[in-house]
Amino acid sequence: MVEKLVSIIMPAYNCVDYISESIKSVQNQSYRNWELIVADDNSTDGTVDAVRSMAADDNRIHLLETDINLGPAAARNRAINAARGDYIAFLDSDDIWYPDKLSRQISFMEQMGYDFTYTAYEKINERGEHMGVVISAPKSVNYSSMLYQGDPIGNLTVVYNAEKLGKFYVPDIKKRNDFALWLKIMHDCDRAYGLDEVLASYRVRAGSISSTRKSK
């Protein structure tokens, strides 16, 4: 079976200490048909140079640059706008995917006919050490359960079917813009489905881009 293209959305800002490891976790995927779109938000450290170096050796990596810092929502939206994939996935520049993350999740979606999915994940510290904390993936959530019971979805685990649902852009709000995005998607697909396998590592550190999971 021909693998459909997955567009991976990665905003980046002053993350030179972590972004190479994050990108390598994408390059190590057993699922090979992907494009990684790194939207830099006017970094002032060596982030851009690190991405340029890796992109020079792998034409699946694309760097979007800007001379204005506009925040993570705008960065994600620039990457989403450039995405060509049948599926859209999200990974922040300090987080890590397990090697079979995409293959397991895309297979899950195609076998079950699901258009919006997420997985379980673990927490690691700034040094990449396991913290012994796993965030499980509920079987499914819908708009109402998200509003009244909270958001169990880790940004780094989400994949949605852009070929079927179209593209969704991140609301430009200061807090929980990922949560607002999931609600937008659920207006069209009603429900998101969880694959309760740990397939990613969320790095807990000061200054992390993602607004999800900091309180858990």
Identify what each model region corresponds to.
Residues M1-Q27:
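N-proximal low-complexity "stem/linker" segments adjacent to membrane-targeting elements
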Residues D17-S20, D45-M54, I96, D100:
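Acidic helix N-cap motif at the loop->helix transition within catalytic regions
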Residues S25, R32, D40-D49, I68, ...:
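A conserved acidic beta->alpha catalytic loop
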Residues T66-A83, R104:
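Glycine-rich, basic loop-to-helix element that forms the pyrophosphate-binding segment
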Residues I88:
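Short aromatic/hydrophobic "clamp" motif used to bind/position activated sugar donors
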Residues D100-M131:
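Conserved donor NDP-sugar-binding/catalytic core segment of glycosyltransferases
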